[in-house]
């Protein structure tokens, strides 16, 4: 999700939020260094003000960041409920398909950007844990002489149950991250999971750090999509994979007309009734219409340096999963 370009980096370390300072930062975090291989970039306040879109409204780039932040700050508490209502629960299937397409291997280091409420992170942890448990069972069957105590020890180690896999959830909105942490606590997710407040356009991570980068229903809210894609490329290891789940352009004319009616006449009403917020959901609908087509977004991903870029339409193109690989050092 886009937001003002000046922000304080915070980390969640078990007890609460703490400002990350020099000499006290999570492994792999950058200490406000230059852009590296992407080249030095000026701070936002030094940039010439340019215009962009906020839904169908034309605003300055700086203004858009603030407006998008306010939208997600406003909808955070009802975000998951509204996702279920707006999509009739189908968003859960789309996210499951994203994980199926990812098929993470043991030890996968995942960065989930704009993933504040944890939907992708929790699915990832469930997937790798199930995968590791299947591997353990095969090993146990091959070692018939193990005692019950040895078997119990193998299953009691929660960190080991993930096979070394880890997910870092990065979001620019503190309220969204707050909801995600509450869900993690309620559902018992602890191991292999960390939360970082950060901007998709200026990720606070070292180069070549992650195996997979995911962003689900977030990149259309970024002010500079090209910069977010370049950052995704930077933080991925050579051989790493970019996966984006995002609303796209419907490829069925009849469904497209029905979808427009539902989007503009029903979703904002649901937003008002359930979340008490018509304007935020009006923006979300408009932002979908402003997002590039499947082919245009594919070209943007390729321009950022990714190779073997493909996309798959889901539900007649209402959403699409774009995939690309970082196959060389930049």
Swiss-Prot record:
Belongs to the class I-like SAM-binding methyltransferase superfamily. MenG/UbiE family. The keyword Mitochondrion applies. Component of a multi-subunit COQ enzyme complex, composed of at least COQ3, COQ4, COQ5, COQ6, COQ7 and COQ9. Interacts with PYURF; the interaction is direct, stabilizes COQ5 protein and associates PYURF with COQ enzyme complex. Transmembrane segments: none annotated. Pathway: Cofactor biosynthesis; ubiquinone biosynthesis. Keywords: Membrane, Methyltransferase, Mitochondrion, Mitochondrion inner membrane, S-adenosyl-L-methionine, Transferase, Transit peptide, Ubiquinone biosynthesis. It is a peripheral membrane protein. It is an enzyme of class 2 (transferase). Its main location: mitochondrion. One of its GO terms (cellular component) is extrinsic component of mitochondrial inner membrane. It catalyses: 2-methoxy-6-(all-trans-decaprenyl)benzene-1,4-diol + S-adenosyl-L-methionine = 5-methoxy-2-methyl-3-(all-trans-decaprenyl)benzene-1,4-diol + S-adenosyl-L-homocysteine + H(+). S-adenosyl-L-methionine binds at residues 117, 171, 199-200. NCBIfam families: MenG_MenH_UbiE, PRK00216.1-5. It is found in: Mitochondrion inner membrane. It comes from Bos taurus (Bovine). InterPro entries: SAM-dependent_MTases_sf (IPR029063), UbiE/COQ5_MeTrFase (IPR004033), UbiE/COQ5_MeTrFase_CS (IPR023576). Residues 1-42 form a transit peptide. This is 2-methoxy-6-polyprenyl-1,4-benzoquinol methylase, mitochondrial. One of its GO terms (biological process) is ubiquinone biosynthetic process. HAMAP family: MenG_UbiE_methyltr. Its EC number is 2.1.1.201. GO terms for molecular function: 2-methoxy-6-polyprenyl-1,4-benzoquinol methyltransferase activity. Methyltransferase required for the conversion of 2-decaprenyl-6-methoxy-1,4-benzoquinol (DDMQH2) to 2-decaprenyl-3-methyl-6-methoxy-1,4-benzoquinol (DMQH2).
């Amino acid at each position: 999700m886009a937001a003002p370009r000046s922000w304080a980096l915070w980390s969640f370390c078990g007890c609460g939020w703490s400002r990350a300072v020099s000499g006290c930062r999570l492994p792999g975090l950058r200490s406000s260094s230059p852009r590296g291989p992407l080249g030095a970039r000026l701070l936002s306040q030094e940039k010439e003000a340019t215009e962009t879109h906020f839904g169908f409204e034309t605003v300055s780039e700086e203004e858009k960041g603030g407006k998008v932040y306010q939208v997600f700050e406003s909808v955070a508490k009802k975000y998951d409920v509204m996702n279920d209502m707006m999509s009739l629960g189908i968003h859960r299937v789309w996210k499951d398909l994203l994980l199926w397409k990812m098929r993470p291997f043991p030890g996968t280091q995942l960065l989930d950007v704009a993933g504040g409420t944890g939907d992708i992170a929790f699915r990832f942890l469930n997937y790798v844990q199930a995968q590791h448990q299947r591997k353990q069972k095969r090993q146990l069957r091959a070692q018939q002489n193990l005692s019950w105590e040895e078997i119990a020890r193998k299953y009691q180690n929660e960190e080991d149950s993930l096979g070394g896999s880890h997910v870092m959830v990065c979001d620019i909105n503190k309220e969204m991250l707050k909801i995600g942490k509450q869900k993690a606590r309620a559902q018992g997710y602890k191991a292999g999971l960390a939360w970082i407040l950060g901007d998709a356009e200026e990720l606070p991570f070292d180069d070549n750090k992650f195996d997979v980068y995911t962003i689900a229903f977030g990149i259309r809210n970024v002010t500079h999509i090209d910069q977010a894609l370049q950052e995704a490329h930077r933080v991925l290891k050579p051989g790493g994979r970019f996966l984006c789940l995002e609303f796209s352009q419907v490829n069925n004319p009849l469904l497209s007309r029905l979808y427009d009616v539902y989007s503009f006449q029903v979703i904002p009403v649901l937003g008002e009734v359930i979340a008490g917020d018509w304007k935020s959901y009006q923006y979300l609908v408009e932002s979908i219409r402003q997002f590039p087509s499947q082919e245009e977004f594919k070209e943007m991903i390729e321009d950022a340096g990714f190779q073997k870029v493909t996309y798959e339409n889901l539900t007649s193109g209402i959403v699409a999963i774009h995939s690309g690989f970082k196959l060389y050092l930049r």
